[in-house]
A protein has these predicted regions:
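Non-catalytic accessory segments flanking enzyme active sites
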Residues: 22-107, 193-196, 227-244, 248-261, ...
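Conserved blade-register residue in beta-propeller folds
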Residues: 89-90, 132, 172, 218, ...
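Active-site-proximal cap/loop segments of hydrolase catalytic domains
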Residues: 431-627
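A flexible loop/linker signature enriched in serine peptidases of the S9 family
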Residues: 80-87, 119-129, 143, 159-169, ...
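Polar, glycine-rich mid-to-C-terminal structural blocks
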Residues: 175, 179-187, 192-199, 203-206
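Cap/lid segment of the alpha/beta-hydrolase catalytic domain
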Residues: 104-107, 359-473, 480, 515
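A conserved hydrophobic secondary-structure block that centers on an alpha-helix together
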Residues: 96-153
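Short loop/turn segments that connect beta-strands within beta-propeller blades
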Residues: 93-95, 133-137, 174-178, 220-223, ...
Length: 627
């Protein structure tokens, strides 16, 4: 039973939370059903064929040459990895063995290399250990924390946490010994998340975020901390000026205000002032803005208006910042990006001109950009991908969306390459709530605006069906994590298959009411202003109830829709009992093998060989359902 003091409600599947033995028994039963459906959907030979297709697709993405640090006389090599355990692999130039890292930084003392790096205790657990490899030894910090690490003036900066996902204490330590620990800042408010931001010429910032509303601190070269622009609500740190002042963009007062650039003299235009900002470099005079998923590269100047150099669907890759942070060969450093239709590529900006080096990476998809009108009159962007190998019209349609936390839609479509090759169209809907435009766009999708984001998604699906001639019987929708609120609410609205015939879900957030009512869970208090706080009173309880997919389903479940759902047993972001509750509710108290769930032993994401196998199984099952 849910009990908030002022209100109680019955939860028929509460046992999935409290009775571990019963839950584990139910999960084993669901896993057996899932494997039976998977085996019936294709032979072992077909399964292995699709698994190898996924391995080949991801292999094509990991073709980047190792990065040399320093560039001219390298001490270490770094190999960025995509969609594998860890984000990077690194090693000393004379060391045959590569180590994985989630983040790392490099410092040279008298031409001797020091490398600070973080590693997840178990891949996917989100509980990171700080390591420092010195020329003669290795030390490990006793406290775990977040994944980011930075070195500045012989000190290592790291955010500690007492529990995974609750990182709240910025500390610095001696680079050489790991001793002399100093607490730089500790966040006491449980709803605020803090994170390190490394910018140009080793300028270090700390950002605190509370449902999109931000605070910015500058970590000075001496290791002190200074709050910047207390009236600012949104920030984009840039670096440090020639007179050693912090440079940053700020929106003052509210999200509708234009960007102001503090500490530097670039001229801005209205488009930049209103857009989100992904990247900027004072040395290269480059800025990358975003709107409705589209990024624009600008050449910036202190004397003339910004010059538009390039636009398209792409996002800068994390390691693009490295040469700018280190201040090494910044004027010629490439900007690495990835798009939704080709492997990662780079571009170079020099003398207000751009060279896009994408000719060597052949596209695997054709891109079509469009907009849909949401029921409240708001225009919502989308991107449609079709196979570059075939001119035939697509036979089936997959539509994916996320729309939460101000996080940009993932443009990595590697997982969809086998689907495109099989004649599917794959679409991304840039619904409100996400970070595909500016901060106002994200704010429009928070709290009660989440249901408007569902309307955005619905409008995009209908227009994409008209564009592709793929009706509901050939349409599948995909949502992961907080994207589960979108697909779950649409499924509650169309349980008989009138809009789509299939739902594909990974770690879906579908029991918002119960999760948001439990402050003991690691993310609950962070999310009160993103979704709702049912404990606050009847108004927000009703809001959470309306947005919670499990509670908005009709009594008969969803008899007209196939659902494939995956979760991880050790997931602490979206606990696996949410997916189990949802599947049981979708069946409407009847035997129904068109709703299936598999729970593996991993965390919020699946990695390695198991990921390829799961993707292959899902591909065969859904293609069998949507013949």
């Amino acid at each position: 039973m849910g009990d908030l003091g002022f209100l109680q409600w019955e939860d028929p599947y509460e046992w999935t939370e409290t009775n571990h033995a019963a839950r584990n028994h139910a999960i084993r039963y669901e896993n057996r059903i899932f494997k039976h459906i998977a085996h019936a959907s294709g032979s072992e030979r077909e399964l292995q064929k699709e698994k190898h297709a996924y391995m080949a697709a991801y292999g094509r993405m990991n073709t980047m040459k190792p990065i040399r640090i320093p560039q001219d006389n390298p001490h270490i090599l770094i190999s960025p990895r995509l969609q594998v355990e860890g984000v990077y692999y690194w090693k000393h130039v004379r060391d045959p063995k590569w180590k994985y890292a989630d983040d790392l930084d490099f410092w040279s003392v008298q031409d001797a290399p020091y490398v600070a790096y973080t590693q997840d205790v178990v891949v996917g657990k989100l509980d990171y250990t700080l390591h420092v490899k010195t020329p003669t030894s290795h030390w490990t910090h006793k406290k775990n924390g977040g994944d980011a690490v930075a070195i500045m003036n012989h000190r290592v900066y790291f955010i500690e946490g007492d529990e995974p996902l609750q990182y709240n204490r910025l500390v610095s330590l001696s680079l050489y010994t790991g001793q002399q620990r100093k607490v730089i800042y500790e966040e006491k408010n449980p709803s605020i998340v803090i994170s390190l931001v490394k910018q140009e010429n080793r300028t270090l910032f700390l950002i605190g975020e509370d449902a999109g509303y931000q605070r910015l601190w500058w970590i000075t070269p001496t290791g002190s901390i200074k709050r910047l622009d207390a009236d600012g609500v949104s920030f984009k740190p840039v670096g440090c000026s020639k007179d050693d002042r912090p440079v940053y963009f700020v929106r003052q007062g509210d999200f509708t205000k234009p960007w102001t650039l503090v500490g530097h003299g670039w001229k801005l235009n209205r488009e930049i002032e209103r857009s989100g900002i992904d990247f900027c470099s004072m040395t290269q005079n480059v800025l990358i803005s975003r709107h409705q998923g589209v990024r624009t590269v600008w050449n910036m100047s202190t004397t003339s208006e910004p010059k538009r150099l390039h636009s398209g669907f792409f996002t800068p890759l994390p390691f693009t910042d490295w040469p700018f942070w280190r201040g090494e060969s910044v004027t010629t450093a490439p900007i690495w990006v990835r798009g939704p239709s080709r492997p990662p590529y780079k571009f170079l900006v020099a003398k207000s001109e751009i060279y896009v080096d994408s000719e060597k990476t052949r596209p695997y998809a054709e891109e079509t950009r469009g907009e849909s009108m949401s029921p409240d009159g708001l225009r919502v962007g989308w991107l449609l991908l079709t196979s570059a190998k075939s001119q035939r019209k697509p036979r089936r349609l997959m539509v994916a969306a996320y729309g939460a936390y101000g996080t940009s839609t993932n443009l990595d479509t590697t997982r969809w390459i086998p689907w495109l090759d099989a004649g599917w169209a794959v679409a991304l809907a840039f619904v409100r709530g996400g970070g595909d435009s500016n901060e106002s766009w994200a704010e429009l999708g928070r709290m009660s605006g989440k249901l408007f984001a569902v309307g955005d998604f619905e409008a995009c699906i209908k227009d994409l069906q008209r564009r592709t001639d793929c009706g509901p019987e050939h349409t599948c929708i995909f949502g992961r994590s907080a994207g589960g609120l979108l697909i779950g609410n649409l499924l509650s609205k169309y349980p008989t298959g009138d809009l789509f015939h299939c739902v594909y879900a990974e770690a879906p957030y579908v029991d918002l009411l119960k999760t948001a009512s439990n402050p003991a869970l690691p993310l609950t208090e962070y999310e009160y202003k993103e979704f709702a706080n049912p404990r606050k009173g009847p108004a927000e309880f009703e809001q959470a109830l309306r947005m919670s997919p499990i509670h908005s389903l009709p009594a008969g479940g969803a008899p007209g829709v196939h659902v494939l759902c995956r979760s991880g047993k050790n997931d602490i972001q979206v606990y696996p009992y949410e997916a189990l509750k949802w599947i049981l509710t979708l069946r409407g108290n009847r035997e129904d093998t068109s709703k299936i769930l598999h729970v593996n032993s991993q965390y919020h994401s699946t990695y390695g060989a198991e990921m390829y196998l799961e993707y292959a199984e899902d591909f065969l099952i859904i293609n069998n359902w949507l013949k």
